[in-house]
Amino acid sequence: MTATQTSASVVHDLGALAHRLSHSARTRCVCEPPQVLADRPDGTVVRSGAIVAKAHAADTDREALAARIALAAAPQLTGILLPPLTAPEHPEPSDASPRPGLPEPPTPTPRPVTLWPFGAPVDPTDPEAAPWAEAAVLLARLHRTRPPFRLPPMRGPAKAARAVARMRAARPGDPAVLPVLACWRALPAWARGEGPPPAPRAGYLCHGDLHLGQLVRHPAPDGPWLLIDVDDAGAGDPAWDLARPAAWYAAGLLDPEDWSAFLDAYRSAGGPAVPADGNPWPELDVPARALTVQTAALALAKCAAEKRDPDEPEQLMIESCARIATLPPELTTDHAS
C-alpha cells in the first residue's frame, strides 16, 4: 500500500488484513468475500467475518487519531463507544503456510489502519425503527462523561469549513453557492472552525459527526446500540452533536415525532447540551445552521462532480440556507453556542 495506491488496492489490502485476523490459519476457511462498507477519500472500511478494518485518510493527524482510539478503548466509555480491537501479536504461527487463494497480508501503509469488531448497523429500509431515542441517550451519556485525558478539539466545525471549501472549488463563480456562503459568513468564527467555542461550552466530550450511520448493535445482531467512528471526537460544544437532527427537523427532513423522541430522550438522560425543559433553540441555533451549511455545501459539490441537479433532500437543505440567510442568528452572549 502506497500513498498513491488506488482505491481497489486499498480495499484489497484491508480485506486481506481483516480476513487474516478473523480466524487462525489452521481453521478451515468458509468466509464470504470481504465486504466494502465504505470507500471515500476520508476513509475506506472493509469487513471480513467479525473483523472490520479501516484505512483513515493519508493526511490524518496520527497523534490526534491515537488519542481518539484510546478514548474509544477507555473503560469510562464502555457501553457508549464501540471499542477498537487490538490485533493479536502473532495472529498466525510464523511457520504457517499461506492459505490457498488468499491474498498476502498488506505491507505497512502511509494511511493509518485501525481494527474494529463488526456491529450490525441501522436498517435504512425501516425508518420507523430508527433508534433516535437510543442515539440521544448515548449522546447524553457521552456528554456527561468527563474526558479521561487531554483530547484534541472536536472536528465538527473543521469539517463544515472543509465542506464549504470543497463547494467553492467545485463551483467557482456559480450563483447557486451564494445563499450557502451568506449563511456561512453569518456564523460566529468558532462555528466556522476559526477558533474555540465559548469557554462555558468548550470542554465537553463530543462525538463530532452524529447521524444514524454512526450506530451499531454489538454484539451483532441484537446487542446494545453503541456509537462508532471516533475520527471527529474530542472536546467541544455538545450542541454540535444534536445539530444534524435539529437541522433536518428544521428543513422538514426529520419527522416531528422523531425529533421529539430524540430531544426528549436526551433531556431525560441528563444531556447538558440544552436546558432540561423549555426552548432548546438558543443552544442549538448556531450548530444547526452550521450543519445546514455543511450539508448544502456537500450537496452542491457532489452535484457538480456528478453533473446532476440536487435531489429533493439536497434541495431542501440548499433552500434552508437561503431562508436562514435572511434571518438574524441568535448570537447573544447568553446563547453563544
Language model features: what each stretch is:
Residues 35-54, 85, 189-242, 252:
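Active-site acidic catalytic loop and adjacent metal/ATP-binding pocket
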Residues 52-109, 120, 125-142:
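A conserved alpha-helical element in kinase catalytic cores
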